[in-house]
């Protein structure tokens, strides 16, 4: 991030532009900037809440776009995707202000820890869904639990091999989210979906 010394505009991009987009000041007036002094404040709580809300809006609009495409509303689908992109930008900006993006090694470590935590959270969700006779919800939670454990293994593997980064192709099951590294499975080991349900990630 950077801040204009003239007009105090804050830019959220990594790279400084040649001029401030608000007042036109030259690049030498655009100085590095970090948000500080927000620990324990409502601003910090609002940034966290904003990140969650924008992330949810991003994903919700992608789901709405998918449904619009199924119903042959191509223009509406494009609108939902465009707004999803904007909401994703908002979420990313909030996360950066929360110092939630570090170097790649730290990001992998944080992602590994979050996946481990998530896989430990799901057993309680599954138990409660079963107790309330919500079998389909329990199944989705079971898929998520099993897939999160796999994600943690992939992050750990990446952490161990960062120095000698291999060119690996990933395949994601569009039913349960299972990620296969290196080869396309004949069927998903978590939900049993056929290989046609996998998408390659470049």
Task: Tell me the role of every PLM-derived stretch.
Residues 1-202:
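Non-heme di-metal
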């Amino acid at each position: 991030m950077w801040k204009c010394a003239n007009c105090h505009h804050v830019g959220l991009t990594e790279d400084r532009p040649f001029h401030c987009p608000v007042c036109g000041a030259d690049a030498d007036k655009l100085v590095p900037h970090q948000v500080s002094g927000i620990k324990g404040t409502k601003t910090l709580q609002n940034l966290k809440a904003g990140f969650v809300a924008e992330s949810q809006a991003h994903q919700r609009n992608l789901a709405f776009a998918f449904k619009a495409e199924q119903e042959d509303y191509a223009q509406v689908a494009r609108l939902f995707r465009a707004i999803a992109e904007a909401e994703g930008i908002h979420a990313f900006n909030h996360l950066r202000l929360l110092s939630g993006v570090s170097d790649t090694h730290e990001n992998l470590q944080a992602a590994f820890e979050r996946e481990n935590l998530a896989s430990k959270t799901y057993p309680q969700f599954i138990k409660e869904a079963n107790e309330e006779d919500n079998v389909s919800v329990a199944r989705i939670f079971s898929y998520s639990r099993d897939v999160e454990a796999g994600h943690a293994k992939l992050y750990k593997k990446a952490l161990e091999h960062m120095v000698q980064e291999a060119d690996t192709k990933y395949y994601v099951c569009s039913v349960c989210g299972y990620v296969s590294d290196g080869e396309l499975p004949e069927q998903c080991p978590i939900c049993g979906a056929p290989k046609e349900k996998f998408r390659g990630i470049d």
